[in-house]
Amino acid sequence: MKEKNSFKGLCTKFEKSIIFFFKFVMYAACFATFFLLFAIDNREIIGLSRTAAVTLSTYLIMLFLLTGIYGKYDVGMRKTKQIVFSLALAAIFTDVVTYFELTIMKTNEANNTTFKLENVGIFFLVILIQLLIILLMTHTGNTFYFWINEAERCLIITSEEEDSKRVAHALDEFQKRYEVNGIVRYDISDLKERIVQADTVVLYEVPVEVRTKIVDFCYQNLKNIYFNPHIADILEQNSKSVVVDDISFFASQFHMITFEQRIIKRLMDIFLSLFALIVTSPILLISALCIKKYDGGTVLFKQKRATVHGKVFEIYKFRTMKEHVGNYSVTKKDDRVTPIGRFLRKYRIDELPQFFNILTGDMSLVGPRPEMLENVEDYTKELPEFRYRLRMKAGLTGYAQIIGKYNTSSKDKLMLDLMYIENYSILRDIQLLFQTILVLFKAEDSTAAFSSEESEDER
């Protein structure tokens, strides 16, 4: 037993190095799988040649970029399934791009005079082996991490215990990492004693002045701190340290999308939406015919939505419900949804007509989801800051849609939208577009990439 504890202590001491080793082995094995198997018929990719240099560079650059977008080897931070899914998607896209690049380079007078896909069997074998490697190394990494690190004892401090049940439920989803030991109000008499007994303190909807005192006490007692942000926190996160004479300040400047960013964003919207409409035109046509044939009703559902600066426009979707039915939210087995509509909703095909909204300039590819006018009015009454999200043009996908779930509160959606607006960049838009592809492969109810709430209310 003593030897076991000493071994665990040694592993704990070199925890980061061991996890780095697992990560290195995984990436190296995936890399070797691709190049060694393709080298069977392409000896030039493992020699000193231009083909080898270009192929190697393409593979490494794509893998680096895509793991940055979809998620890295974050053992201990995410579930094994989530890590495997992200890394697998990054590896597959990397393989596809590198495979086509290699095929194009082989299209010459010395090899094939016309473009021809070769070694397709090897390509799929590479993907299969890489998936097994990723699964094995991720499972090994997470198993090792949670063997070394026990679950953090979490104390949730709140103003309303009822509001924090959702937080507790979210933490319970990661039972190996978090152990919820209690939910208490911030004004209980023995709060400090409860904090001392915890490893991590989660502050949810705690008044700012109280939060400051709790954070100070946690800092003194070396406790991890999680807190949900207020509007001011988001505005301050991009602050710069400024010294005027000998007085220090945090300067938080009003963030506006620049003229250059606006032009690039609009050009991306035009070209990508036009490309999407061309590629999906068969799906659009078949969907329209199926809807019309089913009940002879209208093909498109139209509804007024709010976009940048409160401008009102008509959003387009495929009609998925029977016509002339009640105006209340849809349940999973709602008989108002047609069989065709259920299929369209499941695969989010009902959202495709919104590419016309993007092409005409009413929407953007990336941005806060356009809310129904009634929702904007109601949310603004509840949260006056909700109007801040109208500083950016509404989008088909965005940070709140990708991170959020179908039951994400209006306040949390607002916070996510403001994080997107305050940290806006063209690269961020590109990253979110790639992440949307990841979301499309997830379970229907796992996220709201194309907001479930909104598409459920056809009014």
Task: For the regions a language model picked out, list residue spans one by one.
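Short, glycine-rich, amphipathic interfacial segments at transmembrane boundaries or analogous
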Residues: 232, 300-336, 397-415
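N-terminal hydrophobic signal-anchor/signal peptide
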Residues: 1-30, 139-278, 447, 452-459
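C-terminal terminal-structure detector
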Residues: 2-7, 387-459
